[in-house]
Regions:
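Cytochrome P450 core scaffold surrounding the K-helix E-X-X-R motif
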Residues: 467-471
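Contiguous domain-boundary segments centered on the initiation and propagation of an alpha-helix
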Residues: 38-39, 292, 496-517
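Residue-level detector of conserved catalytic or cofactor/ligand-binding positions
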Residues: 529-539
Length: 539
């Protein structure tokens, strides 16, 4: 039996056995990001704190296990109903596996994903069986199989050093991070990259350096999971800020308010933030709750975060929408973007009705497919409302040209209106003074209030700068879900692995919060378009 690689230390050891013989070592990915002189500024800082941090694996725990149904359709093609995060990606991979382009994919309603359904799992098995037998096939994983197969949130080990002046102003941060990406790459490289690009936090300082290494081990694979690596490095940065506030003698709220990025300032990655940046507003929104809790003597926890929208870092990121006026006299919305529970269909319909003279009854949202709907990339990276939404607006503008000319929907039957938006960004290391890493960021401040007698979480307040809230109720739902998931991650969820690198937990023992165990959650949607009176910014 070959020796197993159980952890990051074994994977990175000299002369370690290789998980893949064709690789020279166990390094899946390496990233180095540097701006300014972090080491120099830290050496001159009045206050310096260094700490080691670790975060565990966690399971997505989506309600619906992976499932695919396939059959031969009337055109002789292998037709796949799939619950995944990109119908077009499934199409490409199944075509490669079968050696034919006679494949169609349509998304069924997806019972949750959170990144756990980005990798193909059962679709190709169903497609292959149908291709060989010419019979309908359904492949659905049991819960135990699902827990074993799909990638998890990465285990991280991190060493961070932060330097601040006497007023708590950050002068520099230097870090090294190591991730266990398991026995397959999955999205280990992109997750590491996102962790590194966001590790500096949403603050105004210019001296930052980070090295990141993702290692192959024989553990279950790790990949995309809500936050995509940002949650891990955010935990380290925010923990250091709390320690720094204690050392300097100011409150956790005050140290964040002093350092918070503001419009026109420059993030540690060099990107200049615009007027839509609302981190300060999220801090101000939770301040009354914070002050009230402190006055009552209740223990509180506070944290800020930023997260990209869109793929960014120079990678092509395109949204596409096709509007077709059908024989029924209605406008049908076709987009290749999977709707996995975040409400994309609702958002596109809202955008359609809000930016045309049509009523809700005039519009039909069609599920993502690969033969009519144009490819809009994966439903991941908080990108679909922004990227595909902008494509929808552009298609609406073309449709309205015909409407303004006096045409009725009956006269427009059969017409197709196509919208496309490419989010242009700069690659990592671009030789420009102020690279655009991402077309947009979201900012948030979270406040946790404990019961001073029991130590249990009593109240969570989450203030999120979301840009334009297309559907505020849906935004609140996403915030509440994120809070619950993060509470489990921070407090009690676990995904232990035995000495043979095999997971040993069942769904019921993962440590998920039950509904009756949850605290009060207040979701504050910070929409700066409603706070500042200004012309809306179009992409």
């Amino acid at each position: 039996m070959l020796p197993a690689i159980h952890n990051i230390q074994e994977a990175g050891a000299a002369n370690a056995p290789r998980v893949f013989d064709e690789e020279k070592d166990n390094v899946c990915a390496y990233k180095h990001i540097s701006r300014g002189d972090a080491a120099g500024e830290i050496s001159k800082a009045k206050h310096v704190i260094s700490r080691h941090f670790e975060t565990p694996w966690t399971e997505h725990a989506f309600l619906e296990p992976e499932c695919a149904v396939s059959y031969i359709d009337q055109d002789g093609d292998v037709f796949i109903y799939s619950t995944d995060q990109s119908a077009h990606q499934t199409l490409h991979e199944c075509c490669m596996a079968l050696g034919t382009d006679k494949v169609k994919v349509q998304n069924a309603l997806v019972g949750g994903g959170f990144g756990g359904k980005e990798d193909m799992t059962v679709q190709h098995h169903a497609a292959l069986l149908t291709y060989v037998t010419r019979r309908p096939v359904k492949v659905k994983l049991t819960r135990a199989e699902s827990l074993l197969v799909h990638p998890k949130r990465h285990h991280f080990e991190m060493d961070f050093t932060m330097g601040c002046d006497e007023n708590g102003i950050i002068k520099g941060v230097k870090a090294k991070v190591y991730t266990d990406t398991g026995a397959f790459a999955s999205l280990g490289g992109p997750v590491l990259e996102r962790a590194c690009t966001h590790a500096a936090g949403p603050y105004n300082y210019q001296n930052f350096e980070i090295e990141g290494t993702a290692y192959y081990t024989n553990n279950p694979p790790a990949g995309a999971f809500r936050g995509f690596g940002v949650t891990q490095t955010c935990f380290a940065t925010e923990s250091l800020l709390n320690m720094m506030a204690d050392e300097i003698g100011i409150t956790p709220w005050e140290i964040r308010y002093r350092n918070a990025i503001r419009p026109g300032q420059v993030l540690p990655n060099g990107q200049i933030v615009d007027e839509s940046t609302g981190l300060v507003e999220t801090l101000e929104a939770i301040k009354p709750y914070y002050d009230e809790a402190i006055a009552a003597g209740k223990p509180v926890g506070l944290g800020c975060a930023m997260k990209n929208a869109g793929v960014g870092v120079g990678i092509p990121d395109t949204g596409r929408v096709k509007l077709i006026v059908g024989d029924d006299g209605k406008v049908h919305i076709f987009s290749g973007a999977s709707c996995i529970g975040q409400g994309l269909g609702t958002v596109l319909v809202q955008m359609m009705v809000s930016n045309t003279d049509l009523t809700r009854d005039d519009v039909v949202y069609e599920r993502s497919n690969t033969w009519i709907s144009p490819d809009s990339g994966t439903t991941s990276g908080s990108r679909q409302t922004l990227i595909t939404g902008e494509a929808c607006l552009r298609a609406c503008e073309k449709l309205m040209e015909d409407r303004r000319s006096g045409l009725s929907l009956q006269q427009m039957k059969g017409r197709v209106y196509y919208g496309e938006y490419l989010a242009k960004t700069d690659p990592l290391g671009a030789d420009v003074p102020n690279p655009v890493s991402h077309v947009a960021y979201g900012y948030a401040t979270q406040l946790c209030i404990l019961d001073k007698k029991t130590g249990r979480v009593e109240h969570m307040i989450a203030a999120h700068d979301v840009g334009k809230a297309v559907n505020p109720l849906s935004c609140e739902g996403q915030i509440e879900g994120g809070v619950v998931m993060s509470m489990g991650y921070a407090l009690r969820e676990k995904y232990p692995i035995d000495d043979n690198c095999k997971p040993i937990e069942k769904y019921g023992s993962l440590g998920l919060f039950r509904a009756h165990e949850l605290p009060e959650i207040t979701a504050l949607v910070i929409d700066l378009s409603l706070i500042h009176i200004s012309e809306p910014t179009r992409l």
